[in-house]
Amino acid sequence: MVMGATSLDEIRKAQRADGPAGILGIGTANPANHVIQAEYPDYYFRITNSEHMTDLKEKFQRMCDKSMIRKRHMHLTEDFLKENPNMCAYMAPSLDARQDIVVVEVPKLGKEAAVRAIKEWGQPKSKITHLVFCTTSGVDMPGADYQLTKLLGLRPSVKRLMMYQQGCFAGGTVLRLAKDLAENNRGARVLVVCSEITAVTFRGPSDTHLDSLVGQALFSDGAAALIVGSDPDTSVGEKPIFEMVSAAQTILPDSDGAIDGHLREVGLTFHLLKDVPGLISKNIEKSLEEAFKPLGISDWNSLFWIAHPGGPAILDQVEIKLGLKAEKMRATRHVLSEYGNMSSACVLFILDEMRKKSAQDGVATTGEGLEWGVLFGFGPGLTVETVVLRSVPL
């Protein structure tokens, strides 16, 4: 018996959702331990036994002063670092000690964020069909996706996807993947988790590798989680916070080696080799034009903005290049100030901050009163993720 084309089309149609993917719940979490940025250079050079490097400390002080960061959360405490001097050296074998932390703490912090996202979503966790877990911190088998499934008590049949070692653009990547999963599987509810712990990158200073110091001045710990699904069931109280309209990824021209990370016996090493803010600002308009041409939008100030805050220079140069008003990056700069650069989790924190502030301010939509918005992830490659978002009325 040959199946007719019509019935096959019907099967395919029945497998797919009718509407666009929406974010149905957001949750965030950070370790309790935190550092005040103004005090961090003294602490960092003391704990790494580097106080004799006075010129380098002055450079690091300037990096921290210019970072626009007020505080950062970190799992690593002073007591722990005192017990693990190899992690405080610039290049000492320390991967085992680092792995012992991240394989436990990455899923644990992810669970905290996931519990909050599920609570806001308001549905039983048995309705979760897919899990996308992302971390740049450590690698293990079975992965953090498996550990989180166990910690949360999700169904064993949950379809899992584990993303390791992607870097700072991956907050956009997880949205792109969750969108495809939700829209191509009717009834799918995707739990997305980004969890980052800097225990894998922390190291002492080196006067021959200043680019490594940049990471020490910016990186921090945090986890964010979302529930993503299409066709929200309003009868049980499902309601989107943002809708995802399109998602794209590109590698910027002439950017090979601009940001590199390498997992070695000494942990994850981080290298900045080119003018990253310049490369991003030079190419960002092309990504915007490609994303918003179908919508007939070319006024970048008419959008709400969620950009990965790799550092203040990236935000400054993007603003100048595009002629953005200062308030466009308010939510982005707030998250950078209060949390630092949490790699893949940052843009999800900014989504959370934006919808909360929009509600507080009494504006018309979750996107600062505007209908259309853009979310950018920037990271190793240089890779850029561009997600077009639509807000919902408040």
UniProtKB/Swiss-Prot annotation:
Catalytic activity from the UniProt record: (E)-4-coumaroyl-CoA + 3 malonyl-CoA + 3 H(+) = 2',4,4',6'-tetrahydroxychalcone + 3 CO2 + 4 CoA
Active site (catalytic residues): C168
Enzyme class: transferase
Any one Gene Ontology molecular-function term assigned to this protein's record: naringenin-chalcone synthase activity
UniProt keyword list: Acetylation, Acyltransferase, Flavonoid biosynthesis, Transferase
Pathway, per record: Secondary metabolite biosynthesis; flavonoid biosynthesis
UniProt-listed InterPro entries: Chalcone/stilbene_synt_C, Chalcone/stilbene_synt_N, Chalcone/stilbene_synthase_AS, Polyketide_synthase_type-III, Thiolase-like
Source organism, top-level taxon: Eukaryota
EC number: 2.3.1.74
Pfam families: Chal_sti_synt_C, Chal_sti_synt_N
An individual GO BP term: polyketide biosynthetic process
List of residues that carry N-acetylvaline: V2
Cited function: The primary product of this enzyme is 4,2',4',6'-tetrahydroxychalcone (also termed naringenin-chalcone or chalcone) which can under specific conditions spontaneously isomerize into naringenin.
Record family assignment: Belongs to the thiolase-like superfamily. Chalcone/stilbene synthases family.
Listed name of the protein: Chalcone synthase
Source species of the chain: Matthiola incana
